[in-house]
Design a protein with these regions (language model features):
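Bacterial N-terminal signal peptides
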Residues: 7-17
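Gly/Pro-enriched, hydrophobic low-complexity segments
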Residues: 114-225
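A short, amphipathic edge element
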Residues: 25-28, 94-105, 155-158, 207-208
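Extended lipid/amphipathic-ligand handling interfaces
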Residues: 32, 63-68, 158-167
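An acidic-aromatic
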Residues: 52-111
């Protein structure tokens, strides 16, 4: 009887230890991403954005993107440039394990390679910021291949990513966004057509292609001064 009671007392401890171990195991995949891109100091790239969204018509848009990880970016365009704010840019350093609760969901095979699916929930919530990220990570190459983003207001974005190899780094050549959202929540739509109709649920696709990468060229911090920035529209 005493042995049975002793075993029962150990069960909660073993369960909590197992959960802690699972979280640590999940976080190590984020560590691997951080390590992979730790040498990426800056880059420039030409961007083309194509929209196929219900109720929204706009021509393809081109711009040059200047990036300096972890959080500096500038868009240079000859006219207003519209870029989805969620999933529209590549920043592998945004997923710092210190900023998220990380949950391991499953192991899987993705495009013939080993992978895992992780759920990331921000520890600090910001108004209108994403509520959860579901990442599909290629663990053979330490690449984010899919990203599902959900927001408190009901927005859903799925990003599918393709990569090329540039100056020792795997960087996106194409990101395809699948959108499910309220039409009138992005005021930027009004710049390209008549006033929006009453709110309705719409879906669509945005294709972003990248070319002419220049990596670790020593971009000056002055490039990112707001006074020098070309007008940028961000939505979704």
């Amino acid at each position: 009887m005493k042995r049975i009671l002793l075993c029962l007392l150990w069960v909660p401890f073993l369960l909590s230890f197992g959960l802690l171990l699972a979280q640590e195991d999940a976080a190590r995949y984020l560590d691997a991403l951080q390590k992979k891109y730790s040498g990426l100091k800056d880059y420039t790239v030409d961007v083309n954005v194509h929209f196929d969204v219900e109720g929204f018509k706009a021509p393809d848009m081109q711009a040059k993107l200047y990036c300096k990880p972890p959080d500096r970016m500038k868009i240079e365009s000859k006219r207003i440039f519209f870029l989805p704010k969620e999933g529209g840019t590549f920043n592998p350093l945004m997923f710092n394990k210190e900023d998220f609760e990380v949950k391991f969901l499953e192991r899987l095979t993705h495009e013939g390679r080993n992978g895992v699916k992780l759920k990331l929930t921000p520890k600090k919530r910001k108004p209108n910021a994403p509520q959860d990220f579901i990442l599909t990570v290629d663990t053979d190459r330490n690449l984010i291949k899919e990203m599902n983003i959900s927001s408190p207001d009901g927005r859903e974005v799925k990003a599918l990513m393709e990569y090329g190899h540039f100056s020792d780094f795997d960087l996106p050549t194409r990101i395809e966004l699948h959108l499910d959202m309220q039409f009138n929540e992005s005021r930027e739509f009004k710049d390209f057509g008549p006033p929006s109709q009453p709110a309705k649920r719409v879906t669509g696709r945005v294709e972003i292609t990248y070319s002419n990468y220049k990596v670790n060229i020593g971009l000056s911090d002055q490039i990112f001064n707001e006074t020098d920035a070309t007008k940028l529209k961000k939505g979704f």
